[in-house]
Regions:
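Alpha-helical transmembrane segments in multi-pass membrane proteins
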Residues: 1-49, 218
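Functionally important transmembrane alpha-helices
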Residues: 5-12, 151, 162-219
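Juxtamembrane helix-loop-helix connectors linking adjacent transmembrane helices
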Residues: 17-27, 53-121, 139
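Hydrophobic alpha-helical transmembrane segments
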Residues: 31-32, 68-73, 111-115, 144-149, ...
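Membrane-interface capping segments at transmembrane-helix boundaries
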Residues: 49-54, 229-242
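Membrane-interface helix/loop boundary segments of multi-pass membrane proteins
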Residues: 124-149, 176-183
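Small-polar-interrupted transmembrane alpha-helices in polytopic inner-membrane proteins
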Residues: 143-158, 192
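Small-residue-rich transmembrane alpha-helices that serve as helix-helix interface/gating elements
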Residues: 214-230
Length: 242
């Protein structure tokens, strides 16, 4: 979603980047746009919610080691399970599979790609969609309404049905994490974990050429979804909310 936001805002505000054509943007340009957007939205977050000084400081005691492990594992499992469900639907001919991470990795320098995908994009997206959108809805409504609506907004911004489906599921999990710990850095870490695993998988090619039957897709998806229950309970026990 961050790339769609970059194109919308970047074309309007920074037409000089790479001649103003977003299709020609390099990874360096995307990173510069990430930084520009982070600088733009941090003051908006502070002005809207006026967090107490030091309240967003990164401290392991906010989650505990087990809570942080559950957060990363739950985020990755959620993303992978939805990804497998999408691939299964593609096998059945519902829609084509779209791998945005692989496209970006092929597009330029690996180090810059990783910096953009694993570091900048999660920070930017969580600041906007959990820090601003979800928290704004949450200030006037209940958790589930806010989580569903903010995840739907995140999905629409992707401008792609396949990525949008994943965004809804992952967005709900990240909203749950944010609601539980009340610290924005925790969903940022969870999002970074998802992108790091996806990047490592695509770059290493460890899963390329792997073919399994429909039955095993279903079994793996069911097992992953079942594993989310104890993981979410573990997160809830170590958090301050829910």
């Amino acid at each position: 979603a961050v790339y769609e936001l970059q194109k919308i805002i970047g074309t309007a505000l920074f037409p000089v980047f790479d001649g103003g054509k977003t299709s020609d943007w390099s990874n360096t340009t995307y990173i510069l746009m990430d930084i520009a957007m982070i600088i733009l939205f941090i003051p908006a977050y502070i002005l809207l919610f006026r967090p107490e000084r030091g309240s967003e400081r990164i401290r392991l005691r906010d989650t505990g080691g087990m809570g942080l492990l559950c957060t990363a594992a739950g985020a990755v499992i959620t993303s992978v399970a939805i990804g497998l469900a999408i691939k299964l639907a593609a096998i059945w001919g519902a829609f084509p599979v779209f791998d945005n991470v692989e496209i970006i990795l092929k597009d330029g320098n690996l180090l810059l790609s990783v910096l953009s995908i694993v570091i900048c994009a999660p920070l930017m997206e969580e600041l906007v969609f959990r820090g601003l959108v979800f928290k704004s809805f949450r200030s006037v409504s209940g958790f589930w309404f806010s989580a569903i609506l903010s995840s739907a907004v995140w999905a629409v911004i992707h401008l792609n049905l396949v990525q949008g489906i994943r965004a809804v599921g992952v967005g709900l999990f990240l909203a749950f994490v944010y609601e539980t710990y009340q610290k924005l850095w925790v969903p940022v870490f969870a999002h970074m974990s998802i992108n790091a695993v996806a990047t490592a998988s695509d770059y290493s090619g460890v899963l390329k050429g792997l073919h399994i039957g429909t039955f095993w897709y279903i079994i793996i998806i069911v097992l992953m979804l079942a594993a989310l229950y104890p993981i979410c309970r573990g997160i809830a026990k170590t958090g301050t909310r829910l």
